[in-house]
């Protein structure tokens, strides 16, 4: 089995290293990731300039850094390196990727969706945290993430994604401890109230910052599960945006099996 690992936080992110370490026992692993952070790039690909790839040593393992977006890395790995992948793992992202509002702009999910477009099963992992220093001190949380990554990846390699699912998004809560459980939940529509902050530079020209303020989480969604309940949200996603498609049916039994598979490990 060959696994491709990527992210949107950049090739030097601790989350990428963790994902590599967690996934390595499952098969041959390639790491191809952006050379610098590319958050909120969604499914964006680079068409207006050439892309570069170069090998880099990340203190014990080799990775390929690219000048492109997370979505570009999928194309470059599949076609530039000419390799065939059984699974793509994207993450572990610093910051949760909950709600459709965030999912549709996320580079972490963008890479996973790009893999799905190429017919490769994909799982994206994100963590509700503000800095890696806090996370890396929590050995209990690291062991939980390791178990979830290994079991979810193992499940997809063994059984494939459940029918009707193109990507699985897994969001970890902050400060996880033993007893935490994975829950199968849908994505909320919104996570933030969108804001624009207009400012004026010393020359009198306007410039703008985009930001958001937290909304009250909607129950029975990924946002509520992670932020309020402190549990792990497992959210199946589909690429099919066609409103006229009434034929797509989810394999609920297989999805429930995936969550059981994860919970048995934590």
UniProtKB/Swiss-Prot annotation:
Name of this protein? 5'-nucleotidase SurE
Lineage start? Archaea, Thermoproteota, Thermoprotei, Thermoproteales, Thermoproteaceae
Which residues take part in binding a divalent metal cation? 8-9, 39, 93
Instruction: Name what cofactor the protein needs.
Output: a divalent metal cation
Q: What does this protein do?
A: Nucleotidase that shows phosphatase activity on nucleoside 5'-monophosphates.
Query: Where in the chain are disulfide-linked cysteines found?
Result: none
What EC number(s) does this enzyme carry?
Answer: 3.1.3.5
Keyword entries, A-Z: Cytoplasm, Hydrolase, Metal-binding, Nucleotide-binding
- Please provide one cellular component term from the Gene Ontology annotations of this protein: cytoplasm
Per the record, the similarity remark reads:
Belongs to the SurE nucleotidase family.
